[in-house]
From Swiss-Prot:
<feature type="region of interest" description="Disordered">
    <location>
        <begin position="489"/>
        <end position="513"/>
    </location>
</feature>
<feature type="transmembrane region" description="Helical">
    <location>
        <begin position="304"/>
        <end position="324"/>
    </location>
</feature>
<protein>
    <recommendedName>
        <fullName>Uncharacterized membrane protein YfkQ</fullName>
    </recommendedName>
</protein>
<comment type="similarity">
    <text>Belongs to the GerABKA family.</text>
</comment>
<dbReference type="Pfam" id="PF03323">
    <property type="entry name" value="GerA"/>
</dbReference>
<feature type="transmembrane region" description="Helical">
    <location>
        <begin position="382"/>
        <end position="402"/>
    </location>
</feature>
<dbReference type="GO" id="GO:0005886">
    <property type="term" value="C:plasma membrane"/>
</dbReference>
<dbReference type="InterPro" id="IPR004995">
    <property type="entry name" value="Spore_Ger"/>
</dbReference>
<feature type="compositionally biased region" description="Basic and acidic residues">
    <location>
        <begin position="501"/>
        <end position="513"/>
    </location>
</feature>
<dbReference type="GO" id="GO:0009847">
    <property type="term" value="P:spore germination"/>
</dbReference>
<keyword id="KW-0472">Membrane</keyword>
<feature type="transmembrane region" description="Helical">
    <location>
        <begin position="262"/>
        <end position="282"/>
    </location>
</feature>
<feature type="transmembrane region" description="Helical">
    <location>
        <begin position="429"/>
        <end position="449"/>
    </location>
</feature>
<keyword id="KW-1003">Cell membrane</keyword>
<dbReference type="InterPro" id="IPR050768">
    <property type="entry name" value="UPF0353/GerABKA_families"/>
</dbReference>
<keyword id="KW-0812">Transmembrane</keyword>
<keyword id="KW-1133">Transmembrane helix</keyword>
Length: 513
């Protein structure tokens, strides 16, 4: 068996968690780890002589481990007085070493896994244990304002790619020992750290158990982003509607947890999943709860109005132009007819040309660098729209319709819902081109039936309206004043449903003076 085959066999043994013990022979341990890490130039081996005939080596990943801490907090104490304590309990080592976490391990597979996770491991000759030192470091992105969820009023902190930084940001906001965080490792190759967070006593135990089971059942070699987990654990993978919400905002996650939901943190991504969710939740922005309720209600009504525009306006235009011209006022009908006179295509083809062009421009604006992406989107839309009208490919009313539809889709606060609405426009346009208004009605019936059937971890997707819940209606189409929302949503929370909100009338204060 050549060296490569031996390395592959050793890797397979370690991935299958086969218990290969650490040898007391230092040379054998060094050979095994060297064979295991062959071709990994970022993994560093440093050999040392501790004196009194005792030799050893330390292994770590350069760039993840703080190399300056190795000398100060690991090797120097060993050279001074720890060489005789390596077989002692972790507590003795913990009390002597100035390192946050120290562990002794006898299994080579666990030692290898800890190296990959970013720990340093020290071996000494004649000792069948490896000393795992948690001295992780390296460069990570600092806390910044969320790019995808910026607000005028509210927290400026956003999640980063560091799992423990993200969980700490939530701990800062929810200061209770009832906030539980359960850790998982997913991915045979990546061994990605995943944390399920919930507030014990508020979250429904059945929902939490369901989330745990679904996470444990995930079998995959790599998890690089929370989207992997989302597709594995959602109720209906084939539905166009999202059944989990993702967010970059710690205040949003804290608010979801306090309502009895759970959050799933994934290492190496700033996006945290929350659930269960409803359709109405996807139409809410964090700023709705920071502004005065009258302003929040006005903006929320605008969102629902533009949701209707984003979904139905192109289909209604196609249906009216194709079958129901008599529904238009006479002057408008003549104006549209004169604009469409030189157009060689039916309304559905005209709509598809403009909608697909608009989607292409939107995608180009996202993928291009920020400095030119927005400019390309705006100028591209203006130039292409004007040129298409002048060339007689599309009519001016169609350009207006597509522009209004695009602007309306930007008012939807959650991107995963907005992209679903954009996708559903196309089947509605096809139905409108075949059956007219009746096709739109048919599509709407199918859509509503699907939404009524859809669930998120057993919670109805339209909960609050279907089934109707009086307490939850206060935060669907309107946001009632905080002092009237005295109970948590019963759909998600169990146990303590009281929020403790109470408001004293200022007039009573004046009377008491």
């Amino acid at each position: 068996m050549n060296k490569r085959d031996k390395a592959l066999q050793l890797i397979k043994e370690l991935e299958d968690n086969q218990d290969r013990p650490i040898s007391p022979n230092l040379k054998e341990n060094l050979e095994n780890l060297t064979l295991l890490t062959e071709g990994c130039s970022d993994i560093v081996f440093r050999q040392f002589d501790f004196g009194n005939g005792l030799c050893g080596f330390i292994v770590y990943i350069e760039g993840i481990v703080k190399s300056e801490h190795i000398q100060d907090h690991a090797l120097r104490p060993f050279l001074m007085h720890l060489t005789d304590q390596i077989d002692e309990h972790e507590e003795a080592l913990q009390n002597t070493l100035s390192i946050s976490s120290v562990a002794l391990e006898t299994s080579m597979s666990k030692v290898a896994a800890s190296i990959i996770e970013g720990n340093a491991v020290l071996f000494a000759d004649g000792h069948s244990k490896g000393l795992i030192l948690n001295i992780k470091g390296g460069q990570r992105r600092s806390i910044e304002e969320p790019i995808t969820e910026s607000t005028i009023r509210g927290s400026r902190e956003g999640f980063t790619e560091s799992l423990r930084v993200n969980t700490a940001l939530v701990r800062f906001r929810v200061k209770t020992f009832q906030l539980k965080m359960i850790s998982f490792k997913i991915g045979t190759k990546t061994k990605t750290d995943v944390v399920l967070a919930y507030i014990d006593g508020l979250a429904d135990p059945k929902v939490i158990d369901k989330a745990k089971k679904r996470i444990k059942k995930i079998k995959i070699d790599a998890v690089l982003e929370s989207g992997y987990i989302e597709e594995f654990i959602e109720d209906d993978t084939y539905s166009p509607f999202p059944q989990l919400q993702y967010t970059e905002r710690p205040d949003t996650v804290a608010a979801q947890l306090l309502e009895g939901r759970f959050a799933i943190f994934t290492d190496n991504t700033p996006f945290v999943l929350t659930g269960p969710i409803t359709f109405w939740q996807l139409m809410q922005a964090s700023e709705d709860y920071y502004e005065r309720y009258l302003m929040s209600n006005l903006i929320r009504w605008l969102r629902y109005m533009f949701l209707f525009v984003a979904l139905y306006l192109p289909a209604i235009y196609v249906a009216v132009i194709t079958y129901h011209q008599d529904l238009m006022p006479t002057n408008l009908m003549f104006s549209v007819a004169s604009a469409r006179e030189p157009i060689p295509f039916p309304a559905i083809i005209e709509a598809l040309i403009m909608e697909i062009s608009f989607e292409a421009l939107r995608e180009a604006g996202v993928r291009l660098p920020k400095t030119i992406g927005q400019t390309v989107s705006i100028l591209g839309a203006l130039v292409i729209g004007t040129a298409a009208v002048e060339a007689g490919i599309v009519s001016a009313p169609m350009v207006i319709i597509v522009s209004l539809t695009g602007i309306a889709s930007f008012t939807i606060p959650r991107f995963n819902l907005a992209i679903s609405i954009r996708m559903l426009r196309f089947p509605l346009m096809f139905l409108a081109s075949i059956f007219g208004i009746f096709g739109i009605m048919l599509g709407t019936i199918i859509l509503v039936l699907h939404l009524c059937k859809l669930q998120s971890f057993g919670i109805p997707y339209l909960s609050g309206i279907s089934p109707f819940k009086r307490d939850e209606v206060k935060d669907i189409f309107v946001r009632a004043p905080w002092w009237t929302m005295t109970r948590r949503p019963g759909t998600y929370s169990r146990g303590n449903g009281q929020k403790g909100a109470k408001r004293e009338d200022p007039k009573d204060e004046e009377n008491n003076i």
